[in-house]
């Protein structure tokens, strides 16, 4: 009888149910639920956050690439469009105007008898087939006798070298800005040059003219004589020292013409803080052109304005396709 009762009091084999009940204890169940909850929260929050920051980064990249569209730089034709005609000729200026450039840079040199021509020494040397001749070595009559068509075929109009006054008569009312790049040389160097330039600007009524030069003496003389005239100075690498010229060195100047490899974000910020504009020169290749756009310079001087205009249009299309919005 005792044996029978003992057998009935034994806990029957439950097939592992006890272990399962212990396995799913209240403590374990709470931890499991907490883990599941955290996983659900993570899956609910992380993907949206990831895509939010990913989209934000994409927008930042697009904005950096496309922000120049809010303030596009002036397209400045260096000596006109010298890919289609000889630089600083009426043909080159006409091609640039037809391309609807924003501005034209004119090289300004003075003859031995004091007449200002739209001419650079290197171009004179090509025309005259003389590697050492300078504009100041020749008189007005001698320069007027030179014929560009002898080295460049297919000219549209005059094949003669224009005076500065003739050049301004053609271009000053056709573009937003005219840059006069004044060259200092023998026999008179800076003597009287500022007044000669200002006199022609006044006669041509070129209110949109900018005068800049590598000679700070000349630039300061123009500022002193005509404070309302827009004046710039040049920043480049000093050929003697290999160092960059001082960036902020002329109070009355409103434009800083910078050799384009020297331009970076910091340079642009520093110049803008002084209420001056940054003009990049001379930019003739696609990669530097894109770089100038991304840096947000105010103007780009180029010998190939049509190429720069085409590049800007292509980038503009890309930006709009990527969802960039141009403020109006």
From Swiss-Prot:
Which key words tag this protein in UniProt?
Answer: Glycerol metabolism, Hydrolase, Membrane, Transmembrane, Transmembrane helix
Query: Does the keyword Chloroplast feature in the UniProt annotation?
Result: no
Reaction(s) catalysed by this chain, per the record, are: a sn-glycero-3-phosphodiester + H2O = an alcohol + sn-glycerol 3-phosphate + H(+)
The EC number(s) given in the record are 3.1.4.46
In the bilayer, the protein is annotated as: Single-pass membrane protein
Q: Which Gene3D superfamilies match?
A: Phosphatidylinositol (PI) phosphodiesterase
InterPro entries recorded: GDPD4, GP_PDE_dom, PLC-like_Pdiesterase_TIM-brl
Top-rank EC class of the record's enzyme? hydrolase
Which Pfam families does this entry report, sorted A to Z?
A: GDPD
User: Mainly resides where?
Assistant: membrane
Q: Which residues cross the membrane?
A: 35-55
Q: Where is the GP-PDE domain?
A: 73-312
Q: What is this protein called?
A: Glycerophosphodiester phosphodiesterase GDPD4
Upper lineage: Eukaryota, Viridiplantae, Streptophyta, Embryophyta, Tracheophyta
What gene makes this protein? GDPD4
